[in-house]
């Protein structure tokens, strides 16, 4: 039986805080009672049966374990509201109490709330390909792991036989080829799978032009595996790191994720690495192409991309640059004396890789970077200590649910969901009942704050300050993010206002000042705040490096969400520490406020980049402006945003937004006009912050009715459509958002409606 292990290490792992936040799924053959096994199998069978209607898993395996460990207590009787006019404070309070008890019961012993953070279908295949070519697949992944990965891939196959970019999207060549290849590497035969699953996948591939039409990132990984030729891959010369730093096209000017994904890819490309050509690799060459492998025109294949995968058109200048590099510079760099330049470039890249690894404990900033860097270490030396240390961190990225095992978008979202969850608990204003929960959460938040800048030459390696910030997941991950830092600061200040005996030790003033320093360092000249680092390049550089599949991969722009979080944190800080960097903080708030107003769309909405989508953007846009001192009556931006939200409210009283809003940049309702708990909660929070209760509370009552009636018998909330997003087309899972935001919205509703 599978067990989730929290805050446990293993020999060879470096850590800064005793592995606090680390979450690892381990298979224990003899663990569990027959009843527990039956519960797990029932959850798996139910998901598989309903997989085409309900794509999101509900983290049932994790919840079964934690509810038992934390001795989940009986709940008050569940209230139901027939009409919004019948809402009483008692109904709201009872719903909150039930939700809080459930939420407390799924908190880990180190204070964070674990949860699924996957959703992207191309991550697990990259890991499996890397482990296969390095010969580590069966060493790192037991048969139990491999079986759960097979379960995951089959569960998320579309009815047409293909796989989408995320668990809800239409089938794409990228993820259909990747999933098919991965299943073959996981020892599935070409005719295996229920109802001919493998055959239907292969048929989808061939009917849509074959793997020759996979987008560029797919071509790269297939070349690594040996089922694509490097001559059919866009050039990624490591020499680009020798360009003058001031050039906008220098990759050091890219956003941190793009930079640290491209870095190892240039090394792998420069080495033209190909894994062992096994009988399975040879078989795949004959299975996924519509013509014989040896007759493929690889030069022509280099620019091909299936229409299902082409979210964005690549500009002519990019095609011209790639063609020039392929035909002119690459031949020079592969032969003497140009090969000496390549040798130096490869040495520089691998040195940078080792520097990053040592400073960030071999966790990696994200899954694609992690896997690519791990492969680089093996290419340099298969027996290296670096590669061995990377293998020890693979399981940090794996998550298990009733739909199977998958690779997550980070090594988790522990810090993010913990600070959001803590704010939700505080919003309920039932502190006496949440004492233990708040103590544990503060302990996690305190131990996760970054306390050092690392041993890095910030200019040479394109780094910024880290000390005082908070990461998305764990301290060992170590990358500070503006909104995680801002929300962490907000929570630290809010907890400090509670009685000392309730939460125990508090975060020091010096650490709070360090956090403010990190936040202020991330404000761009346009007044907005980036996520990881300042915006360095120009928008035209984005076009030059455009991917067919992903949006905004080059520049870390200013975002409405990050800007709003930073405004709210700085305002809260300024109220308590009135003299610390006073003028600088006031200027930062005013500039960020103007930025939020400047990027509002004509219809009154804001595009939410980090979640789906316009409801998320509206919540941050409104709350940021309100925190800065704006009001509905004096701010046209707030009025327009409220009008926008109210225009999208469904007849049921809720809101429900499709992930297509993120892809198409246009508000799209869920199918059949369904309401979504999370979108309803975000919209309710935004309207409450704007003062809607004083103007017309009816829309609020209707939304609150949805949240009350959606609660499940055990105090949980249902998993619905996917809510996380990045790069416009990449949707990610946050299974705890339904709990967190339902609690926060009902807590604020209760306060504004019954206690104002």
Curated annotation (Swiss-Prot):
GO MF terms, alphabetically ordered: intramolecular transferase activity
Pathway: Secondary metabolite biosynthesis; terpenoid biosynthesis
Protein's recorded name: Pre-alpha-onocerin synthase LCC
Active site location: 483 (proton donor)
InterPro entries in alphabetical order: SQ_cyclase_C, SQ_cyclase_N, Squalene_cyclase, Terpene_synthase_CS, Terpenoid_cyclase/PrenylTrfase
Site, Transition state stabilizer: residue positions: 416, 610
Gene Ontology CC annotations of this record: lipid droplet
Function, as annotated: Oxidosqualene cyclase involved in the biosynthesis of alpha-onocerin, a triterpenoid characterized by a symmetrical structure due to cyclizations at both termini of dioxidosqualene that inhibits acetylcholinesterase. Catalyzes the first half of the cyclization, exclusively from dioxidosqualene.
Keyword Repeat: yes
Sorted UniProt keywords: Isomerase, Repeat
EC number: 5.4.99.65
Species the sequence originates in: Lycopodium clavatum (Stag's-horn clubmoss)
PFTB repeats: 96-138, 146-187, 438-491, 512-554, 589-629, 638-679, 700-747
Protein family membership: Belongs to the terpene cyclase/mutase family.
Catalytic activity: (3S,22S)-2,3:22,23-diepoxysqualene = pre-alpha-onocerin
GO annotation (BP), single: triterpenoid biosynthetic process
């Amino acid at each position: 039986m599978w067990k989730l292990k929290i805050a446990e290490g293993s020999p060879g792992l470096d850590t800064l805080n005793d592995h606090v936040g680390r979450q690892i799924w381990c298979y224990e053959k003899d663990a569990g009672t027959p009843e527990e096994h039956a519960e797990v199998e029932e959850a798996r069978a139910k998901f598989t049966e309903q997989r085409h209607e309900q794509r999101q898993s509900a983290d049932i395996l994790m919840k079964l374990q934690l509810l038992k460990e934390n001795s989940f207590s009986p709940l008050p009787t569940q209230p139901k509201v027939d009409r919004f006019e019948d809402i009483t404070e008692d109904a709201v309070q009872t719903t909150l109490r039930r939700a809080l008890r459930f939420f407390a019961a799924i908190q880990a012993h180190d204070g964070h709330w674990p949860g699924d953070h996957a959703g992207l279908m191309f991550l697990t295949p990259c890991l499996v390909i890397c482990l296969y070519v390095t010969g580590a697949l069966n060493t790192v992944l037991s048969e139990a792991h491999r079986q759960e990965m097979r379960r995951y891939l089959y569960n998320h196959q579309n009815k047409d036989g293909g796989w989408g970019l995320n668990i809800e999207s239409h089938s794409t060549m990228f993820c259909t080829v990747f999933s098919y290849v991965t299943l073959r590497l996981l020892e599935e035969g070409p005719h295996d799978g229920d109802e001919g699953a493998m055959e239907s996948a292969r048929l989808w591939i061939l009917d849509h032009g074959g793997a020759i039409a996979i987008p560029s990132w797919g071509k790269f990984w297939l070349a690594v595996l040996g089922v694509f030729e490097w001559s059919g891959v866009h050039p990624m010369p490591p020499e680009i790191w020798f360009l003058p730093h001031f050039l906008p096209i220098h990759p050091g000017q890219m956003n941190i994720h793009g930079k640290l994904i491209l870095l190892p890819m240039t090394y792998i490309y420069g080495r033209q690495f190909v894994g062992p050509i096994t009988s399975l690799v040879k078989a795949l060459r004959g299975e996924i192409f519509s013509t014989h492998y040896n007759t493929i025109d690889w030069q022509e294949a280099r620019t091909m991309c299936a229409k299902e995968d082409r979210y964005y058109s690549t500009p002519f200048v990019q095609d011209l640059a790639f063609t020039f590099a392929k035909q002119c510079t690459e031949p020079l760099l592969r032969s003497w004396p140009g090969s000496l330049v390549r040798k130096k470039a490869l040495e520089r890249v691998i040195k940078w890789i080792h520097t990053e690894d040592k400073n960030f404990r071999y966790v990696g900033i994200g899954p694609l970077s992690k896997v690519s860097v791990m492969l680089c270490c093996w290419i340099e030396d298969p027996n290296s200590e670096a590669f061995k240390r990377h293998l020890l961190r693979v399981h940090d990225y794996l998550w298990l649910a009733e739909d199977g095992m998958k690779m997550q978008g980070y090594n988790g979202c522990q810090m993010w969901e913990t600070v959001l969850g803590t704010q939700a608990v505080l919003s309920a204003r039932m502190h006496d009942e949440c004492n233990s929960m708040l103590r544990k959460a503060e302990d996690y938040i305190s131990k996760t704050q970054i306390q050092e800048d690392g041993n890095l030459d910030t200019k040479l390696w394109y780094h910024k300050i880290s000390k005082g910030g908070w990461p998305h997941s764990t301290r060992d991950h170590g990358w500070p993010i503006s909104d995680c830092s801002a929300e962490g600061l907000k929570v630290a200040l809010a907890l400090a206002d509670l009685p000392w005996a309730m939460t125990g030790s508090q975060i020091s003033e010096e650490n709070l000042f360090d956090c403010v320093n990190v936040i202020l360092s991330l404000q761009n000249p346009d007044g907005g705040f980036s996520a990881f680092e300042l915006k360095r390049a120009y928008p035209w550089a984005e076009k030059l490096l455009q991917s067919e599949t992903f949006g905004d991969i080059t520049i870390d722009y200013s975002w409405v969400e990050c800007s709003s979080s930073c405004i709210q944190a700085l305002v809260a800080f300024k109220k308590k520490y009135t003299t610390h960097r006073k003028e600088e903080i006031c200027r930062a708030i005013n500039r960020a406020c103007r930025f939020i107003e400047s990027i509002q769309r004509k219809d009154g909405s804001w595009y939410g980049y980090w979640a789906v989508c316009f409801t998320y953007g509206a919540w941050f846009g409104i709350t940021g402006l309100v925190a800065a001192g704006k009001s509905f009556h004096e701010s046209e931006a707030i009025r327009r945003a409220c009008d926008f939200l109210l225009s999208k409210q469904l007849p049921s009283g809720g809101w429900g937004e499709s992930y297509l809003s993120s892809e198409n940049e246009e508000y799209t309702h869920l199918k059949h006009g369904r309401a979504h708990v999370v979108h309803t909660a975000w919209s309710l929070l935004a309207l409450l912050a704007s003062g809607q209760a004083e103007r017309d509370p009816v829309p609020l009552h209707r939304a609150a009715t949805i949240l009350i009636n959606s609660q499940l018998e055990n105090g949980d909330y249902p998993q619905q459509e996917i809510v996380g997003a990045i790069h416009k087309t990449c949707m990610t899972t946050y299974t705890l958002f339904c709990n967190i935001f339902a609690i926060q919205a009902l807590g604020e509703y209760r306060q504004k409606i019954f206690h104002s």
